[in-house]
Amino acid sequence: MAKQIKNSQLHKGKYQWLKWLLGILCLLALLGGTVFIYILFPPVVAETIVKASDHRQPLTETPKKFGLNYEDVLIPCSEGVTLSGWWLPSPLSKPLGTILLTHGVFHNREQVLNRAVFLVGKGYQVLVFDQRGNGLSGNSPVSGGLLEAGDFPACAKYLADRRWVRQPLIYFGFSLGAISALRAGVSTQYAQAIVADSPLPTLKSYVSRRTIGAPFAWLPGFLGSCLKAYDLKTGLALTENDLDLMPVVKQIKNLPVLYITGERDDLARPEEVQQLFAHTPSPHRRLVYIPEAGHEETFTKYPIVYEKSLMEFLTDLRDGFPDARKYEEEQMKTIKLLEKQVSMKQKGHSEQPMK
């Protein structure tokens, strides 16, 4: 009996020791994981963004390919940065307006050249430019639209100094360019309207969908750790709030804004763009929903839908938005369609999009 008790105590002591060992191993794993996620990994995420910015895509074509006259221009900007772009004059003696047009992150002006060609063909004059840190423009770290927003007023001033501006003046951007256009429209007085094609609402949208930091983007404090690591590499002291676009669009009280989103955009998701639209107080806001379009397909998937919506917006801008009530009804149809598509995705069903 005494021997059985002794054996039982030995087994209990052995299991107790194993429990302690397992607990210590779990604690070490937790500490190691925390150190990796919050200290060792954020610099890797930051470095991938810096390297992507350093690896610039070369220009492979010019407006000449499309039979357009153009002029290479260099535009002085803030922080000593010089922007590079193409000035495309209108074929009309009296241009219908002036459009400043730019691209998305880690790209160059070629990404939006198709839009520029279309707009010039419709009678507008267009300055299409490389955002700072991209293409042939001067060096600058990617700042999620904070520094890039200064590119638009710099371009507007450049044209105004040469008396090249014909009203209305429109800021037009795609992806990061759309973010920059929205920020610039709030902070400067040059623009009469904004066209925001596929804007990303937050830093989390980008990190969680386009970087190696995606698996940890949902963890509290991870994005802040990435921004601190990015600050050490670039000198940009940014916060998540700095890169939140929602407070920006809430300040757009009168400026007409055209939002464009694609049904299958996995980066600037349509429901997120719809939220930006919903929180924009301007009475002349519009939302265009392109069926089946991914992030870089809004213009090419269904060009007729894109071009028609864009020209209606620009025409109404020149005419003072005479049929505002009509478009309110159309916007409600667009929003209901978008909400239906989002609901179908969430339920795991599929449905042919409306064309």
Positions of predicted regions on the chain:
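An N-terminal hydrophobic leader/cap segment in hydrolases
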Residues: 21-76
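Alpha/beta-hydrolase active-site loop
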Residues: 111, 142-163
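The serine-hydrolase catalytic nucleophile loop
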Residues: 105-118, 131
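Short beta-strand/loop motif that positions the catalytic acidic residue
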Residues: 252-253, 259-261, 265
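Conserved alpha/beta-hydrolase "acid-adjacent" motif
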Residues: 266-272
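Conserved alpha/beta-hydrolase
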Residues: 118-138
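Hydrolase active-site cap/lid region
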Residues: 183-238
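Catalytic histidine-centered segment of alpha/beta-hydrolase-like enzymes
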Residues: 293-303
